[in-house]
Structure formats: structure tokens, C-alpha cells
Amino acid sequence: MTEELTPKQAAVLEFIKKSIRQRGYPPSVREIGQEVGLSSSSTVHGYLKKLEEKGYLRRDATKPRAIEVLDNPAGEKVEFINVPVLGRVAAGVPLLAVENREDIFPLPVHFTGSGEFFMLTVRGDSMIEAGILNGDMVVVRRQQDAGNGDIVVALLEEEATVKRLFKENGRIRLQPENRLMEPIYAAEVQILGKVIGLVRKIY
């Protein structure tokens, strides 16, 4: 049986539940502090530890945002996968995407579906008319092919870019979603994956 919570502990727990319910993933330590009026990250960690000790949360301290709510009134368990963040990708001029793991970001399985995934931070504004903005983190399912009109991360001459893919007349067109920018044409490109979603930080 879980122990009774103090008002501040209850506020922290409710904000975590709200974040998972609305966004599909837990809030950061800083977001929790801003929401409930805790200025110190160590204080937030203290509240999370207490909630874990009282049986309301399960955490993995080695991973950011890895918080599972155990007190779930709906009786539903939200399953997460840890998606590697692999650097940056251009949504403008092609930019080398460094295949090194910078971070881990947990996402709910109901958001990603099945498959192998990675995330990249977008730099540039060539996809703004598709709602992909500079600084967004795109969620990419690893696959070597995609259909016409899919938004993909493509490797072109060892540089990666995010564009809409079209196969036409024996060549590939990588189309930006910005009417001020020109498409990229190539005889062939390597598809690294299909963009299936994005995560955006609201300042």
C-alpha cells in the first residue's frame, strides 16, 4: 500500500501524470521545478526519491526522464523505449549527421510503434511548412526505403538532410517544405529512415 503524500509531493506527482497524459513522456527535472515552485534541481530529485520510496514512482537514475508512474488509477501501464539521440541533421543545406549517441530520450511505445528508432536535432528552416522547425527533435524509424511524399532523413554524399522524398524519372528529388528553397536532385541517395514524429521544447 502506498503512503500518504504531502501537498507538495502530490503536486509533483500530479504534474508528472499530466505530462505523460498530454505529451506521452515525463517532464524534465527543470520542468517539474518550474511547475511546482522548486528552484533547486537537487530539491526536485529529493521529492522524486520520496515518491519512489512511497511506491508512487519507479525511476532509472542513469537515464533522463525515465520515470514510471505506479499509482495509475486507470490501471494502465505505459511502456517506454529508450531512443538514442544521434546528433544533428540539417533541414536546410545538407549537414553531416554524426552517428554518435549524445543522449537517450524515453518515448512511449504507443507513440513510436514497432521498429528501431533514433532521434536527431533539426538545424535549419527548410521544413517549416511541414511543421518541422529549427531546434525540433525528429523521431526517425530506421528503414532503407520510403514511399513518395514521405519525410525522410537521407544521406547524400556522406551528409544527412531531412526532406520530403520523391522518386521520379530515374532520379530522386529531395523536396524542402519551404517555398523559398530549391529541391535537391540526385541519381541515388541512401535513406537512413522515415520521420514519424517530433519532440519540441516550448520556451
Swiss-Prot record:
CDD domains attached here? S24_LexA-like
Catalytic activity field: Hydrolysis of Ala-|-Gly bond in repressor LexA
Keywords recorded for this protein, A-Z: Autocatalytic cleavage, DNA damage, DNA repair, DNA replication, DNA-binding, Hydrolase, Repressor, SOS response, Transcription, Transcription regulation
Q: What is its EC number?
A: 3.4.21.88
Point out the DNA-binding stretch(es). 29-49
Q: Which GO terms describe its molecular function?
A: DNA binding; serine-type endopeptidase activity
Q: Which domain of life is it from?
A: Bacteria
Q: Which residues form the active site?
A: 126, 163
Question: An example of a Gene Ontology BP annotation on this entry?
Answer: SOS response
So what family is this one in? Belongs to the peptidase S24 family.
Record's subunit section: Homodimer.
Protein's recorded name: LexA repressor
- Provenance organism: Pelotomaculum thermopropionicum (strain DSM 13744 / JCM 10971 / SI)
The protein's gene is named lexA
